[in-house]
Every structure is written in C-alpha cells, then in structure tokens.
C-alpha cells in the first residue's frame, strides 16, 4: 500500500474526537471493503454489516485493510471530525488538492472545502477537453464556482488564462474567491445575470442536490422541476465558449439521474458541441479521499474524450494530517 499510515498520535486524535459519533451510522469506520467490516471507535470492536447500497451511500471514513489506517475522507465525515478536532486549513487544502497558501476564512472551512471541486480531477478534465490538438483557451467563465477549484485547475492547465467572471450565491464562498482572485468580477446569482461575458472555457460545478445520495427524498422533490443546469446553458448560449467542463455527483450517471444526464448531453449536441463524460475518483489522483464525481466535457471544434485517471501513488491521511499539537491555525486566513 502506498502512503504513510497514521501515527499513534493521529489515531488517538481521530478516536478521541469520533467517540461522540460512535453510535451514529455516519461515523462508522469501514476497515475491510471486501468483508464490509466496520470499526466503531466507541466500542473498539469490529462489527460486520451487510454491505449494500444503503450502507455504501453513507458518509464514512474509509480504512485500508492492509495498513489498518484511514485512507480517505468524505466531506460529511470531514465536517463531523472538524467539530471536535478543528483541522487546520493546510490539512483541508491537502485533502482537496488546493495549494497550502490558499487564503481561507476563519469560519466554515470544513463546509467550503467539503463542497469544493477536487483540483487534480478538475485539472485532468480541463486538459482533456482541450486535448493535444486544441488551442489553449485565453479566457475563463467560472460558474457555480465555490471557492475557486476550477479556476485553480484552469490556471495550472493554461497559465495565461484570464477569468472574466465567476458566479456563486454563498457569501462565504464569494468572499473566499475574491480574497484569492481579487481581480475577477463577481457576477452574482447565476439565475439573475442579465449579460454574460464571452469566454473560451466555461466551467461549472452546478448544484448536485437533486442527484446526491445524501439528499433526502423531500429535497429531491423540491429540486425536481428546477432544472438548474438550464441556467448554465443560458450562460453557454451567451458566452459561446469553445470548451465546457461540468462537474456533478456520480449519481447523475445512475438510473435515477440518467434522464437529466441525457438531457444535458442532448442540450450540448443541439448547440453543436461534441461531448464525453467520465466518473473520476479523487483517490486516483493522489488525494487521501474517495470522492467520485462525474465530469462532462464539451467542445465545439472537434471530438473530445476524458482519458482514465493516470496511475498515481495512493495517499493516506497519515501523509497529510498533522499531529494535534502541530495543527494550529497559522494558515493564511481572513
């Protein structure tokens, strides 16, 4: 197994601060995926549960059976853990592939990073949509931008790119984006923008509530008729980008979400775009979490594909977490 296991101090931190959640389904720690053994830190015993879709849909801290230590975090478990341990912003940055110099607010760090796009996955998608034969985009329009994961990925892929505007409705995310990218115009709520700037590349991690397993049935019903992606296509019609990259939860490709996926792909084709899509796992790009997301890429001037993830050494939480005494908030914050 690649990656460094957690040391005793780090394990103690996780055990101590997960005890309060030990009886909750959300805190069950899965040790062996094949046998679906679950470790409960409250009782320190192994419990074997039938591993079905309902259990796999829960937010869990995944363990590697060989190393016996945590190898990945999902965003919900990350938020639970942060309530007790107060992770440093540096640790969050490492988990999602952000630079450690990224400036963050003093509050809502877990929430902002939990909802952020994994930068290495976004980078792979941005490079894929242009391919080896496409002209590098000079301008970016960043929709449903969060704290700027797609912006970072686009800058890594195309160093000369300039972002002409971003959209998000969460005040903390907008503030964080502006702190890190002060020259980019904030366009406000995507549903209320009247005039869109032209751009070569458009990215959007549009809301996933209607398709997410973590979303409750009532919430799905509320979102059923909203068709939020139609607002993204309003921007596409106005900006007319040559390249588009969309990100969402992998459930969009499951039977319940497939009608929406088909509608999105057909909307691209009706506009003359060539499309492709692939589910990517953040762990395959060296991040210490299993985070599956679907990336939809579209291109006007040629065919497009998203290659499989490159071979990469797996990273464990032991590689990125600091000991409790070192995990102080000395990070760049506002």
PLM feature spans:
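S-adenosyl-L-methionine-dependent DNA methyltransferase catalytic core
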Residues: 1-164, 169, 174-178, 267-271, ...
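Short, solvent-exposed polar/charged micro-motifs at secondary-structure junctions
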Residues: 116, 195-199, 286-290
């Amino acid at each position: 197994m690649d990656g460094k296991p957690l040391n005793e101090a780090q394990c103690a931190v996780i055990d101590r601060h997960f005890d309060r959640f030990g009886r909750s389904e959300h805190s069950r720690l899965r040790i062996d995926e094949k046998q679906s053994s679950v470790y409960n830190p409250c009782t320190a015993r192994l419990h074997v549960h039938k591993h079905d879709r309902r259990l796999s849909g829960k937010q869990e801290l995944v363990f590697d059976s060989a190393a016996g230590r945590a190898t990945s975090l999902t965003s919900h478990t990350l938020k639970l853990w942060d309530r007790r341990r107060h992770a440093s912003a540096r640790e969050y940055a490492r988990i999602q592939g952000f630079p450690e110099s990224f400036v963050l607010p003093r509050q809502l760090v877990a929430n902002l990073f939990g909802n952020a796009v994994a930068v290495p996955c976004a980078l792979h998608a941005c490079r894929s949509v242009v391919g080896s034969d496409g002209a590098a985009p000079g301008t970016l329009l960043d929709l449903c931008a969060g704290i700027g994961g797609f912006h970072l990925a686009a800058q890594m892929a195309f160093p000369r790119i300039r972002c002409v505007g971003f959209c998000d409705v969460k005040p903390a995310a907008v503030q964080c984006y502006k702190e890190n990218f002060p020259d980019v115009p904030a366009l406000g709520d995507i549903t209320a923008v009247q005039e869109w700037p032209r751009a070569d590349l458009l990215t959007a991690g549009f809301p996933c509530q209607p398709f997410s397993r973590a979303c409750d049935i009532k919430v799905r019903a509320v979102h059923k008729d909203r068709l939020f992606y139609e607002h993204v296509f309003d921007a596409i019609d106005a900006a007319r980008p040559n390249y588009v990259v969309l990100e969402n939860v992998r459930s969009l490709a499951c039977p319940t979400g497939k009608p929406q996926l088909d509608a999105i792909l057909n909307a691209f084709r009706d506009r003359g775009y060539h499309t492709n899509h692939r589910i990517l796992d953040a762990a395959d790009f060296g991040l210490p979490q299993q985070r599956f997301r679907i990336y939809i890429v579209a291109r006007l001037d040629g065919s497009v594909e998203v290659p499989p993830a490159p071979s990469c050494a797996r990273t464990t939480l032991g590689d990125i977490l600091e000991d409790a005494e070192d995990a102080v908030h000395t990070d760049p914050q506002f």
